[in-house]
Amino acid sequence: MNANPTFLAATAEVDAAAVAPLPKSRKVYETGSRPDIRVPFREIEQADTPTMFGGEKNPPLTVYDTSGPYTDPQASIDIRRGLPALRRAWIEERGDTEVLDGPTSDYGKERLTDPKLTAMRFDLQRPPRRARAGANVTQMHYARRGIVTPEMEFIALRENLRREHYLETLRASGPDGEKLAKRLLRQHPGQSFGAALPSAITPEFVREEVARGRAIIPANINHPEIEPMIIGRNFLVKINANIGNSAVSSGIGEEVEKMTWAIRWGGDTVMDLSTGKHIHETREWIIRNSPVPIGTVPIYQALEKVDGKAEELTWEIFRDTLIEQAEQGVDYFTIHAGVRLPFIPMTADRMTGIVSRGGSIMAKWCLAHHKESFLYERFEEICEIMKAYDVSFSLGDGLRPGSGYDANDEAQFAELKTLGELTQVAWKHDVQVMIEGPGHVPMQMIKENMELQLKHCDEAPFYTLGPLTTDIAPGYDHITSGIGAALIGWYGTAMLCYVTPKEHLGLPNKKDVKDGIITYKIAAHAADLAKGHPGAAIRDNALSKARFEFRWDDQFNLGLDPDTAKEFHDETLPKDSMKVAHFCSMCGPHFCSMKITQDVRDYAAAQGVSEKDALQQGMQEKAVEFVKKGAEVYHRT
């Protein structure tokens, strides 16, 4: 697809690379209590264990799937029409919303009637909705009234990953099925740092966590296309992928491609951080084609409306922007309401000052007017807008540290306390909240961030950017931050915002997006393992079994990135025959540790002794052989 002005709605096409199923994978669905609750998963086919290793069946493995209909061969994908409105019936039957005649924001009306935008505009036939007068349509409001919504049931099924089904298929796989099931479901005890991880997620548990404020379901009533998901420390750790154009790079087509690419590899949510041309139109195309929640930073677009002059921002412009984006279907807003006038001087001695774009915008406004932030002063009015559309807060950390030097300083924690106070205000309105966190933090200082967030914000979900654990690796900050992300995820962070290799350097392309996502999927999964999340080790165990049995294709396919794993293997062992070889190019055929281990097991079986006895017996035989050959360390050839 081409960029900015040349993007044409009539010829828009889905990215072919995003729609093909992953190798040996198929889309499967689990139906809930009603036929329109169909929860998607990816099922990975496995080969049978080779006869020499026991010849047992290896049933398909179910994994979490964020790719939506794009990887379902039965789905008809046309990005000009958008995705099906999965939640429409659920929203309508609640009877607490009204259909509007059209956009009610001034800017939304302006864009809709601008003839110059016709060729690039998404042709949405469905008008927006909002809450009826006096109604509250948030998932938190329903949860606090004791209502288990279809979204909550959908999430419960999704979080359980069909573990019971997998257990049953293992048990039915053969005469040793029970033994195999016990082996593959084995998991080391975790350290959850106070998180309450039930053995199975129920719809009622989802409701309780949302009612308590410990979890959020980002699900704007104007984004019926999403497949519901949850963010909370008692659930699987999630990751977010940032996309978005700039004034000098990328356009609508590229950003839609990045979104479909991001969800293919595991992005649980996507933030559109566009700051260039056609922000409104870009966002519409992304939302209409996204099965995952979309977040934004509304102050970015508000700033564009005043030609980049922060001091000219007004509450009226910002309010109109909130309504504009809420009526498009944005699921969560990053709002930097904790950047207060008294906190700005606290950043004076920092090495890197205020590095958050949103934070710096509001700091400049506060200083220009020498007034308290209108985001802080008008926070209750913002809550009224949020609950009319069920937009969740992502309370921004505008004073986050931009270097390890500035980590855990007075400004950062003053803002965090304020975010905790604002959380209580939002909860008074039954508006869902998560809290954004740093940033750049050395490893030994990360745990304090989590502990203080839990204390000040009353266990509202934490959503962190990394944190980056060192500042010496431009070009590799997906790694410096992945280390911190794994740690803070273990300590209790609910969602990790990915960092790409281009962080601090430039706008990420599709490859950067994938690299960032895979890095953060690793971090999130490592955190789930460390917390002891039920069933977290199943995929690890299945892949380890495949590795030991030299099922190369299964190793590739069970991994997070089958394409890259296969590519690396094929660089040195490209032939199909090498896919059944009992070695890889690292050690070769004579030094493969797993092959040697298997040889020991075969020897033990042949001798009718234990592996331990086989090792001892084998060493004795080799000792005798050594003496018979003259007891020489080296022999002439």
Curated annotation (Swiss-Prot):
Does the keyword Oxidoreductase feature in the UniProt annotation? Answer: no
Q: How is the cofactor bound?
A: Binds 1 [4Fe-4S] cluster per subunit. The cluster is coordinated with 3 cysteines and an exchangeable S-adenosyl-L-methionine.
- Which pathway, per its entry? Cofactor biosynthesis; thiamine diphosphate biosynthesis
Q: Name one GO cellular component term.
A: cytosol
One BP annotation, GO: thiamine biosynthetic process
Give the enzyme class: lyase
Q: Where on this chain does substrate bind? A: 242, 271, 300, 336, 356-358, 397-400, 436, 463
EC number(s) stated in the UniProt entry for this protein: 4.1.99.17
- Residues annotated as binding Zn(2+): 440, 504
**Named cofactor requirement(s):** [4Fe-4S] cluster
Which superkingdom, per the lineage? Bacteria
The reaction(s) annotated as catalysed by this protein in its Swiss-Prot or TrEMBL entry are: 5-amino-1-(5-phospho-beta-D-ribosyl)imidazole + S-adenosyl-L-methionine = 4-amino-2-methyl-5-(phosphooxymethyl)pyrimidine + CO + 5'-deoxyadenosine + formate + L-methionine + 3 H(+)
Q: GO: which molecular function terms?
A: 4 iron, 4 sulfur cluster binding; carbon-carbon lyase activity; zinc ion binding
Kindly give the InterPro entries that the UniProt entry links to this protein. Answer: ThiC (IPR037509), ThiC-associated_dom (IPR025747), ThiC/Bza_core_dom (IPR038521), ThiC/BzaA/B (IPR002817)
Sorted keywords for this record are:
4Fe-4S, Iron, Iron-sulfur, Lyase, Metal-binding, S-adenosyl-L-methionine, Thiamine biosynthesis, Zinc
Q: How does it assemble?
A: Homodimer.
Task: Say which family it is in.
Answer: Belongs to the ThiC family.
PANTHER family, sorted: PHOSPHOMETHYLPYRIMIDINE SYNTHASE, CHLOROPLASTIC, THIAMINE BIOSYNTHESIS PROTEIN THIC
Cited function? Catalyzes the synthesis of the hydroxymethylpyrimidine phosphate (HMP-P) moiety of thiamine from aminoimidazole ribotide (AIR) in a radical S-adenosyl-L-methionine (SAM)-dependent reaction.
Protein name, please?
A: Phosphomethylpyrimidine synthase
Gene name, Swiss-Prot/TrEMBL: thiC
